[in-house]
Amino acid sequence: MFIQSFLLLLAIGFLSAGRVSRPEERIIGGQNIEIEQAPWQVSLQVNGEHSCGGSIYSKDIIITAAHCLYEKERRLEAKDFLIRVGSSLWNSKGTLVKVAAIRSHENYNSTNLTKDIAVMRLSEPLNFTDKVKSIPLAERNPAPGTVAMVSGWGATSTYPKLSYPVHLQGVDVLILGVNQFFLFAGSYGQTSCFGDSGGPLVVDQQLVGVVSGVFEYCDGPTQFISVSDERSWLLNAIASIKL
């Protein structure tokens, strides 16, 4: 219990000591992975560019972060998005699918990123293959010390300038703990940052978190929205967006 409390306090200390960055997180300390290793991973694209990550929940539902539905404070519409599935490369191969409807949490707060979660309904159902698969929602939070995987196309370095990969990245991170708002995971050298927002945090082939915010220079833990904490909202939102 002491170790669990210490890890959580460490995460909170990291994120309170520095400003938490809002959008677009990146993979730090990761490596190239193939889409078959994370077949639920998708790239949200706006104006032909990768903007955020997301996860396939079903043949027509994507889970992502609420702040991914905004561009410079402007609320985007479903028609503004294309979703690339089934490719390790954000800019080629796989399939591009249009979005029919979007819904973010009604209590989403853009200042502190609480309730930073959203769902999207695709305009046509996906064909599942070894490169395109759904991922189930976790029913409980993982214990501190659990190893999880985070993936995405976010920046891989920040100095001397931001460097973004074309190829999907993945990294194993340590679960630090949860509080009433967020799940924390990662550390200096192994974390998320600019471009990975909305992407998956996975334990035992289950979606446990959605990338939300990070330490200002992406050199500390990442805060995720807990999927188990938002499970009821997700299931209700998915049902409503299918109507």
Model-derived segments and spans:
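Extracellular/luminal ectodomains of metazoan preproproteins built from arrays
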Residues: 4-36, 129-130, 141-148, 235-243
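Catalytic histidine site
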Residues: 34-76, 216
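Chymotrypsin/trypsin-fold serine protease catalytic domain
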Residues: 87-88, 100, 117, 122-123, ...
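Conserved, well-structured core segments
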Residues: 40-43, 52-63, 117-121, 149-152, ...
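C-terminal subregion of chymotrypsin/trypsin-like serine protease catalytic domains
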Residues: 2-14, 57-70, 81, 172, ...
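Conserved, non-catalytic sequence blocks in retroelement Pol enzymes and Pol-derived host proteins
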Residues: 29-35, 108-112, 161-163, 191-195, ...
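Conserved H-D interstitial segment of serine endopeptidase catalytic domains
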Residues: 20-26, 44, 62-107, 166-172, ...
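Extracellular/periplasmic catalytic domains that process cell-envelope and extracellular macromolecules
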Residues: 33-37, 56, 75-77, 91, ...
